[in-house]
């Protein structure tokens, strides 16, 4: 019945998803002419469309045995393995495609995608660049290259390539979304928000974009918009555990502990074996000063996912504050084994050494921490502290000044500078920093007292208004604004009016 029908008609049936009819057409052709490679290709595609992947693999293999130089078939063959999660076989197939056509951009891109999934970022970068070299309009390869740079924290490079992808394919909402992620990661929060809003203007129901927009608003401490978008994302897809974790994180930042735990409980009803849920539960306990409870949660996370460095690091932090130094060091060393280039790990290893009065080890670890994360004021303070202990006064001055440049309100840094200048004989400067230290210390006592009361009474708007006023009186408007936003979210008209006045003053 079908031998007279053409290969073209078979492919038209595939386009209309009439896979069983297409299988009959191509089978009839192949039975008459088993060397018809186009019919074999169509038959494999039809079997794949019908959901019979093993049969599709068998047909592709038969076709390649007849002519191994079919680079398009090697790519299609590789795609089947990639979709099954067999990255090694997929990569082998894509390499065969490139062997027969070194300019095959899909083969180059797909091989790079597999390598990216395998975290072989350097080789993946090479193949993405080759794909772009042979097709300067290949926006998919540009987006993938940008994603590699995002994963490597090379945000400026990521933005460059994602902008190029946007120019190559201005209609791609996916490219615009990735560009927004890159801007947020590069701390261009407002630019990231703009990209996300452009995507949602076209497709307002996308849960992932709403979630990431909510996170971006949270980074700007716009709590109402953050909660609105994250909650909308959950409404669209309530099974996404990261959305529940983000919601919990926002609530905890607002001292809404019950709501924070409730969000995580919803996540646990979906899957109790996700380590990140227990880490977030631990964070809530830690932020409230309950280190034993925090440690239990972090240890659970480490049991569930022992390969996750963050679980061990968090356990180490809790153990450090519980003064269980040997156990803390063991946890940090395990984290270091899993994530060797992380400033926070070396920072706490240095603090463990400081607590043991092992100044040499402390200095070495803190120097490594500062090298990996030179924008962390606490690292520079602790480095200055150990240099003070070993009477390296000039080095201590330099370290403490770097800490001060990052955070001029750090009371410990101010006190340290006062002591250093006293030792260096610069008494005027010493008195200046010590006087400033007393001011900040008193301010911190007052804010800490209010924060404790807010955690106990999270719906008390008056307490938040008093806290915001404390920051305003110190001209620390950037810290007053998020607290006023919290109060406004809870329904304070006074906070809304204050916010409006402050934002009008600081708006460029």
Question: What are these model-derived regions, one by one?
Answer:
Residues 1, 143, 178, 212, ...:
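Long, contiguous interaction/recruitment modules in multidomain scaffold/adaptor proteins
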Residues 15-24, 49-62, 83-96, 117-130, ...:
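Structural signature of tandem alpha-helical TPR/SEL1-like repeats
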Residues 431, 439, 448-508:
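Terminal, low-structured helical/coil segments at or just beyond the last alpha-helical repeat
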Residues 5-28, 32, 42-49, 79, ...:
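Alpha-helical segment of the N-proximal tetratricopeptide repeat
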Residues 32, 66, 100, 134, ...:
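Structural marker of alpha-solenoid helical repeat scaffolds
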Residues 3, 37-38, 71-72, 105-106, ...:
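Helix-start (N-cap) detector for alpha-helical repeat units in TPR-like alpha-solenoids
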């Amino acid at each position: 019945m079908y031998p007279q029908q053409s290969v073209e008609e078979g492919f038209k049936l595939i386009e209309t998803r009439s896979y069983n009819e297409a299988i009959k057409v191509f089978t009839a052709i192949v039975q008459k002419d088993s060397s018809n490679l186009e019919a074999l290709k169509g038959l494999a595609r039809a079997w794949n469309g019908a959901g019979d992947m093993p049969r599709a693999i068998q047909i592709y293999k038969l076709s390649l045995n007849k002519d191994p130089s079919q680079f398009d078939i090697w790519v299609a063959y590789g795609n089947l393995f990639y979709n099954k999660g067999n990255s090694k076989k997929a990569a082998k197939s894509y390499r065969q495609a490139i062997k027969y056509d070194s300019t095959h951009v899909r083969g180059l891109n797909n091989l790079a995608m597999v390598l990216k999934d395998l975290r072989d970022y350097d080789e993946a970068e090479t193949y993405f660049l080759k794909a772009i070299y042979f097709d300067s309009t290949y926006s998919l390869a540009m987006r993938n290259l940008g994603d590699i740079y995002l994963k490597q924290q090379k945000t400026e490079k990521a933005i460059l390539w994602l902008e190029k992808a946007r120019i190559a394919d201005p209609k791609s909402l996916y490219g615009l979304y990735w560009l927004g992620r890159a801007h947020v990661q590069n701390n261009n929060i407002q630019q990231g928000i703009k990209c996300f809003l452009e995507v949602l203007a076209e497709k307002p129901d996308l849960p992932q974009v709403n979630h990431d927009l909510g996170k971006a608003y949270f980074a700007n401490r716009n709590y109402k918009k953050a909660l609105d978008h994250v909650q909308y994302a959950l409404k669209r897809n309530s099974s996404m555990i990261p959305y529940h974790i983000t919601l919990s994180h926002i609530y905890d930042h607002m001292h809404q502990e019950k709501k924070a735990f409730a969000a995580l409980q919803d996540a646990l009803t979906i899957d109790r074996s996700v380590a990140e849920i227990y880490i977030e539960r631990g964070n809530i306990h830690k932020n409230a000063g309950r280190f034993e409870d925090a440690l239990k949660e972090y240890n659970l996370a480490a049991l569930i996912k022992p390969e996750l460095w963050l679980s061990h690091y968090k356990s180490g932090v809790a153990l450090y504050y519980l003064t269980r130094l040997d156990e803390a060091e063991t946890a940090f060393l395990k984290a270091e084994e899993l994530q060797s280039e992380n400033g926070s790990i070396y920072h706490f290893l240095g603090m463990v050494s400081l607590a043991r009065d092992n100044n040499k080890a402390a200095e070495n670890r803190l120097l490594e921490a500062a090298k990996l994360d030179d924008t962390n004021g606490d690292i520079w303070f602790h480095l200055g502290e150990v240099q003070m202990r070993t009477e390296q006064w000039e080095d201590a001055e330099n370290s403490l000044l770097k800490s001060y440049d990052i955070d001029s309100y750090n009371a410990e840094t101010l006190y340290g500078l006062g002591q250093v200048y006293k030792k260096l004989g610069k008494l005027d400067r010493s008195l200046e920093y010590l006087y400033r230290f007393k001011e900040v210390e008193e301010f911190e006592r007052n804010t800490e007292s209010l924060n404790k009361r807010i955690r106990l009474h999270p719906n008390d708007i008056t307490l938040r208004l008093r806290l915001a006023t404390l920051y305003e009186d110190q001209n620390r408007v950037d810290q007053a604004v998020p607290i006023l936003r919290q109060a406004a979210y809870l329904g304070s008209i006074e906070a809304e009016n204050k916010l409006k006045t402050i934002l009008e003053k600081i708006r460029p």
